[in-house]
C-alpha cells in the first residue's frame, strides 16, 4: 500500500499532477500457487491446455454495467464509457485491491497486460498467440503487434511467464 499512498501524496502535493493515477496487476508464484493482486483494468490471464481464462475483474463502469445486466458483452465492447476506471492507485485514499489465488500446473502460461492491449485484442486472439508460439518473447511481441495493428490507442504493456513444476528431489 506504500506505493498507492506515495502516488496519492504526490498527486495532492503538486497541482499539475492532480488526477494522476495508475492501474496495476501483480503476479507472484510461490511453489505451485499463483497469487494475483489488481486495481483498475490491467488484467491477468491463465493459459492452460489450449484455453484462456481471465483471472482478474476490471474495475470499470462498463464491468459494473455488465454485472448488473444493464448491458450485454457485445454492447460493452463499444460502450462510449468503456475507459472509465472505478478503482485506481493514487486517485483516492481508499482503494479496493482484488486478490486471486490459483493452483498452477506444469506448462501453464501467465499473461499480464495493460488495458492498451486488452481493449484492442480479443481474448480469443490472445489465446491463439499463446497457442501458436512457444517462446514468451515472441508471444509478447505478437500481442503488442496485434494491439498496435488494431489501432494502439493507449500504452501497451505485456508480461508473460511460463510455469514449470519443480521435480521433488529425494534426499
Feature locations, PLM:
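PP2C/PPM-type serine/threonine phosphatase catalytic domain
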Residues: 1-171
Amino acid at each position: 500500500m506504500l506505493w498507492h499512498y506515495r502516488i496519492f501524496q504526490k498527486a495532492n502535493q503538486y497541482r499539475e499532477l492532480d488526477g494522476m493515477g495508475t492501474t496495476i496487476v501483480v503476479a507472484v508464484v510461490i511453489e505451485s500457487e499463483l497469487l494475483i493482486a489488481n486495481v483498475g483494468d490491467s488484467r491477468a490471464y491463465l493459459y492452460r491446455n489450449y484455453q484462456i481464462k481471465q483471472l482478474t475483474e476490471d474495475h470499470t463502469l462498463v464491468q459494473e454495467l455488465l454485472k448488473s445486466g444493464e448491458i450485454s458483452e457485445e454492447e460493452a465492447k463499444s460502450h462510449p464509457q468503456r475507459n472509465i476506471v472505478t478503482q485506481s492507485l493514487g486517485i483516492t485514499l481508499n482503494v479496493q485491491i482484488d486478490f486471486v489465488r490459483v493452483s498452477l500446473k506444469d506448462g501453464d502460461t501467465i499473461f499480464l497486460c495493460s488495458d492498451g492491449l486488452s481493449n484492442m485484442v480479443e481474448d480469443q486472439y490472445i489465446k491463439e498467440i499463446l497457442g501458436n508460439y512457444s517462446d514468451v518473447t515472441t508471444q509478447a511481441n505478437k500481442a503488442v503487434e496485434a494491439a498496435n495493428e488494431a489501432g494502439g490507442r493507449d500504452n501497451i504493456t505485456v508480461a508473460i511467464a511460463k510455469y514449470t513444476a519443480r521435480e521433488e528431489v529425494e534426499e
